[in-house]
Amino acid sequence: RSRGLGDVYKRQILGLHLEGHYLNMAMAGGQIPENIKSPDPNEYIPIVETWSCIKRWDAAPELPGAMQFGKYITAKGILASVAHTQAEFEDIRTAYEAGYTHATHFYNAMPGFHKRREYKYEGTVESIYLLDDMTVEVVADGIHVPPTILRLVYKIKGVERTCLITDALACAGSDSREAFDPRVIIEDGVCKLADHSALAGSVATMDRLIRTMVQKAEIPLADAVRMASETPAKIMGVYDRKGSLQKGKDADIIVMDEDLNVRAVWAMGKLVPETNTIS
């Protein structure tokens, strides 16, 4: 299906984002624990050399070999992002210097400010806030990150360093009550591990993110739209052709009504017929 969409709407599938599997086991979340490991150059170098479609790869920077991994993929033009991590401030600062300039699903699968016995410590979240130029993304469905925290991210990181993502599974946008993974259930408008130990992805579509940011987090519509278009395009290095309505760019246009429901979609200048509800 993805290949078919790519044939119809040229340049719409921009590349691959690999979220695993160089992650912290303690922050596995919906990842498969058996696959989690530390970065291994004997594994990732052949992958990068073989697959030029990889545009982004995540890792927990506190793992052995993570700094070497970050430097390597950054040199290859791949965005390095921190994810599923328990990194402390020095880990994050060193990681940023090694090329990790972005944070995957910020606030999820990473600790915030916490206490160990009688002492208090910054978490990964605060460490990322302290690096002004580090960009973040948030699952803005209102469940993965509550609206009050979405507004906090907006106030601290700002429009130009925050982008909105769905982190959605294949069941997003459907009426399905079952996920493709038997470990996962769909409940309360979100995917969860069946044992209720963690969230496991969303069922949100991008229009829902806009509605959440505007109607619940009380963020200006123009800024919410920029965080869903302009900012991610800049982070991924495709702003020359995506992310804004300008002459010469790809004509990707969404028309919404006053309640922010989708009324029509143009992809690469072509109207997607099944989306058109404009009379």
Annotate each predicted stretch with a short phrase.
Residues 1-9:
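Single conserved hydrophobic/aromatic residue that forms the stacking wall/gate
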Residues 24-50:
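Conserved phosphate-binding/catalytic loop of the ribokinase/pfkB sugar-kinase fold
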Residues 120-138, 154-166, 171-256:
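His/Asp/Glu-enriched, well-ordered alpha-helical/loop segment
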Residues 260-266:
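Short, Lys/Arg- and Gly-enriched loop/turn segments at beta-strand edges
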